[in-house]
């Protein structure tokens, strides 16, 4: 009887497990079908202004069965491909998650409907059941990131300045010139891509938001962007509304990294005063020592025109990262400041609003966390 009872309990448990698994699978399938229907409805609404749609078998042919992997990011894997007419493309295969669904629709709703010389073109897409992909124009030189954080100044100052100006023009178009204003929310070196001629194009609109022209701010439910490039008001709503000035802040941090040819936070800096580049650069500008100090750490010759470019990039960058968003210029104004036209950029006020200074606070934190931890001291 005891054995019979144990057997009955075991059978009952197994039956319950089977029922649970079926219900769980059914629930998961229902969720995925619901997501699929949502995306298909979205694509239906945008059909009249969409790039080309490809099937999954066509993607396999375009990428030679996904043979040439270009890179991998938070939302999926990117492969090199070739269209039938000979155009090279970058094919991003998105992972299966709610975040990738959101990125897919964001990219299609933004890049799929606009065109600008300094924005990466979305050439096509694929959506079949649980598989989704985006096809972009191929950018032969990859991201700006791999050129500004390396030993030996691969890009000359004139070329670097041209890249900064081109990226600024692309972002200004998003804010002020396209039919529906767009806030990118993830401006950083990794998302500035370079073609074979080093023409810069803003990429990765997975976090972007459309912004009505009649609105003075945008509502978001969570912080967006990459730490180190995120504007203060995105961390705390007490610091004011979220607007296109959040992109201006991110561009300012990018511009400072280009001017310094280093990350804004350098945990290996020989002096704590140099750990946070924006603060160090501000102090050097105040003392009139910026070009001299940057010459000391650069590996290429710097003429007077190069010095002017570095000085202008740094000043504009510091204007862009002002703590109060109202004190930051618009991206259209940033373009004008970089274009110069003989006008000097006025010295920016102190961008930071904290005591102790951000540099000293960051220095203590990062040295304890990284430097001391890595060296064992």
Predicted regions and their residues:
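Membrane-proximal cytoplasmic juxtamembrane segment of single-pass receptors
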Residues: 1-135, 140-167, 214-221, 226-227, ...
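Pre-DFG segment of protein kinase catalytic domains
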Residues: 201-204
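Activation segment
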Residues: 207-209
């Amino acid at each position: 009887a005891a054995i019979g009872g144990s057997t009955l309990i075991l059978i009952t448990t197994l039956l319950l497990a089977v029922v649970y698994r079926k219900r769980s699978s059914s629930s998961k399938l229902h969720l995925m079908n619901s997501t699929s229907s949502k995306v298909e409805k979205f694509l239906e609404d945008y059909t009249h202004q969409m790039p080309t749609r490809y099937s999954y078998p066509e993607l396999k042919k375009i990428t030679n069965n996904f043979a040439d992997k270009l890179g991998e990011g938070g939302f999926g894997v990117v492969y090199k491909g070739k269209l039938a007419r000979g155009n090279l493309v970058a094919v991003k295969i998105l992972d299966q998650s709610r975040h990738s669904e959101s990125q897919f629709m964001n990219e299609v709703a933004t890049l799929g409907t606009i065109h600008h010389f300094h924005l990466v073109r979305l050439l096509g897409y694929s959506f079949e059941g649980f598989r989704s992909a985006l096809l972009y124009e191929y950018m032969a030189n990859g991201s700006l990131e791999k050129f500004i954080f390396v030993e030996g100044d691969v890009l000359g100052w004139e070329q670097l300045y041209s890249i900064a100006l081109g990226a600024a023009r692309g972002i200004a178009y998003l804010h002020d010139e396209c039919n529906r204003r767009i806030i990118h929310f993830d401006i950083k070196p990794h998302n500035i891509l370079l073609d074979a001629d080093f023409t810069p194009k803003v990429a990765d609109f997975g976090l972007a938001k459309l912004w009505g022209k009649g609105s003075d701010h945008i509502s978001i439910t969570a912080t967006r962007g990459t730490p180190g490039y995120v504007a203060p008001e995105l961390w705390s709503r007490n610091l004011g509304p979220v607007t296109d000035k959040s992109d201006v802040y991110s561009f300012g941090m990018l511009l400072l990294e280009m001017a310094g040819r280093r990350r804004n936070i350098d945990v290996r800096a020989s002096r704590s005063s140099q750990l946070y580049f924006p603060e160090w650069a501000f102090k050097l500008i105040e003392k009139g020592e910026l070009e001299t100090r940057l010459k000391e750490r650069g590996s290429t010759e710097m003429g007077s025109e190069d010095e002017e470019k570095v000085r202008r990039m740094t000043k504009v960058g510091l204007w862009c990262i002002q703590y109060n968003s109202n004190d930051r210029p618009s991206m259209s104004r940033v373009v004008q400041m970089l274009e110069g036209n003989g006008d000097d950029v006025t010295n920016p006020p102190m961008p930071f609003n904290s005591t102790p200074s951000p540099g000293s606070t960051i220095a203590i934190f990062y040295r304890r966390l990284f430097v001391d931890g890595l060296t064992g001291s």
